């Protein structure tokens, strides 16, 4: 679900940036020009990797949660009806809870059954729905939702779509313009191999800024600029973070998204098969259905998950126990009681 181990080039780039780069858009001397070039290279490479024609529509954020908050508050107004895929993280559900009188609909379909999911989604996507929010890959189960088909349905019904690509960016193809999504949010520190505190928001058009402030552009104007990326990027950039993220994206381009996914999928199959041989262990696996990424959940009957995680941690095995900040996913997957 995250990448603790980074390419060495990421740390080196961050160290260089901390000592050699200034703030982009805040001058014309070499250090700020170099920061501007780093920003541009990062946006341009991200745009190529994720199907965005104009790099200006790649917005830097502090994390996927930041980007999802922008997306939600840009599209969801008080009293709106929102259709959720059922696997949303609190980064989606809590912003929705902060908006008055929002009506939520949730797709309920069995785990790892994309065809049934699509049938239920289509049934619930009635004319009353104002926005659809779809998690591309569940951070709890690794379930790969059929986002291409979801996007096609949203285009036909002319309903704006927000995609949470937190677990899929860098792991599966993300094609923002092909999908026609209004927003696609992703963190830098997971499949993009960048540092914590970085993220990207891919925007079809503008959005509503969460914070206002200096951008280095239109400084006489009291309002935020109406063009991207400045409209959504108030304040000083995380320049070392962007430099590290750029190197993470370069690593991803060199290795190839498909090749990294195949490696992760092989490891997941191996882990699932091994765990399934152990007594009292229930594994939540897609088997051979091909709709699971590099995230695997399991439970040990009669044992508290926190105790299991502690025991494994003492043996050098890193796992996470609990709700994973996604109680809705547990409710949809039928694992709330575990």
Give the location of each predicted region:
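Pyridoxal 5′-phosphate
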Residues: 1-338
């Amino acid at each position: 679900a995250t990448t603790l181990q980074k390419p060495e080039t990421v740390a080196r780039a961050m160290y260089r940036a901390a000592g050699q780069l200034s703030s982009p858009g805040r001058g014309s001397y070499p250090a700020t020009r170099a920061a501007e070039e780093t920003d541009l290279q990062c946006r341009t490479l991200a745009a190529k990797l994720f199907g965005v024609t104009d790099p200006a529509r790649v917005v830097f954020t502090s994390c996927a949660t930041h980007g999802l908050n922008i997306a939600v508050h840009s599209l969801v107004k008080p009293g709106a009806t929102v259709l959720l895929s059922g696997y949303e993280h609190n980064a989606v559900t809590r912003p929705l809870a902060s908006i008055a009188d929002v009506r939520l609909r949730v797709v309920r379909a069995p785990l790892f059954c994309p065809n049934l999911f699509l049938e239920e989604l289509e049934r619930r996507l009635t004319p009353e729905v104002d926005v659809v929010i779809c998690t591309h890959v569940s951070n709890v189960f690794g379930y790969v939702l059929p986002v291409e088909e979801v996007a096609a349905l949203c285009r036909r019904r002319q309903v704006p779509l927000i995609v949470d690509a937190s677990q899929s960016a860098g792991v599966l193809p993300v094609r923002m313009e092909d999908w026609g999504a209004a927003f696609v949010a992703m963190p830098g520190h997971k499949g993009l191999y960048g540092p914590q505190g970085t993220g990207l928001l891919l925007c079809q058009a503008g959005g509503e800024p969460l914070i206002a402030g200096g951008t280095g552009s239109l400084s006489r104007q009291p309002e935020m600029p109406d063009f991207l990326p400045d409209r959504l990027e108030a304040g000083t950039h995380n320049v070392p973070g962007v430099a590290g993220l750029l190197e993470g994206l370069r690593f991803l381009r060199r290795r190839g998204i498909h090749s990294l996914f195949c490696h992760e999928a092989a490891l997941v199959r191996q882990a699932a098969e091994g765990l399934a041989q152990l007594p009292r262990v229930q594994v939540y696996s897609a088997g051979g259905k091909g709709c699971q990424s590099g995230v695997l959940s399991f439970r040990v009957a009669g044992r508290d998950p926190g105790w299991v995680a502690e025991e494994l941690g003492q043996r050098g095995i890193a796992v996470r126990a609990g709700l994973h900040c996604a109680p809705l996913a547990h409710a949809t997957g039928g694992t709330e009681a575990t």
